[in-house]
Amino acid sequence: MNIGIDKISFHVPNYYLDMTDLANARETDPNKFHIGLGQDQMAIIPETQDIVTLGASAAAKILTDEDKKDIDMVIVGTESSTDFSKSAAVIIHDLLDIQPFARSFEIKHACYGGTAALQQAHDYVALHPDRKVLVIAADIAKYGLATGGEPTQGCGAVAMLITKEPDLLAFNNDSVFYSEDVYDFWRPAGHDYPLVDGHMSNQIYIDSFTRIWEQNKKVNQTDSTDYAAITFHLPYTKMGRKALRAIFPEMPESEQQRLE
């Protein structure tokens, strides 16, 4: 039985800031943002929206009345929670009028929350193949005015309906994973903005990717030729390319060009 993403949608606000305008305001070269980071626009969240409205708006675009009857679980992966106790998933569950006998909860783990939610959804559908799980990844990234992280800010939400025999994408059962306790990025209680060591965070990203790449080759007996494409989580646009280039030495030039 295949399990995976049957439907997917996303939502971002109507407001954005052009990165050239931000560069001019900060008296810096726009190419630092456009080329150095690969960022052209920054989504801006209005005061009337939060991760709940972003997530509900994304999900509303794909769910039918029949889906809402079949959903047993609503999971929100976020590090921009609106409450220390109340889950955003519970509010979204109500806004979307999903049948009441469903689990609704939130997963917080920096950049990993949405992926963890997908793994949880997969396992549930494997045990309950006639039921569905709604997974939402929603965040509002804020670093403060004139900080190093300012040009990497943004906001948005992705909604995914996880089912058996999906129309869009089926998950393989070959995941590999890695954990390390580092303080490159965190936001303690009482802080409005995260504490970030940008250079360290970049290096941790690359090092973690190369370690998990080697582990994947070892466990699943794969190499780059087994992949049509590689999808990255992106703190900013260029980060994925930097990580990919870290494994280029093991590939012929033709393979490098294909993947990049």
Residue ranges and their predicted role:
Residues M1-T48, T147-E214, V219:
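Condensing-enzyme catalytic core mediating Claisen C-C bond formation in acyl metabolism
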Residues I5-K7, F33, I62, V74, ...:
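Buried hydrophobic positions in well-ordered alpha/beta secondary-structure cores of metabolic enzymes
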Residues S9-H11, G77-T82, H109-G114, A137-K142, ...:
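Acidic, glycine-rich active-site loops and adjacent beta-strand->loop/helix elements
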Residues K32-G36, D40-T53, E79-K132, A246-E260:
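Conserved catalytic cysteine-centered active-site region
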Residues A58-D72, T210-A228, I247-P252:
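Phosphate/pyrophosphate-binding loops at sites that engage ATP/ADP/AMP, CoA/4′-phosphopantetheine
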Residues D72-S80, E106, I230-T231:
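Short glycine-rich or small-residue beta-strand-to-loop segments that form or flank ligand, phosphate
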Residues A126-A159:
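Flexible, glycine-rich active-site loops centered on histidine and acidic residues
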Residues M200-K217, Y227-R241, F248, E260:
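A conserved active-site cap/scaffold subdomain adjacent to cofactor or substrate pockets
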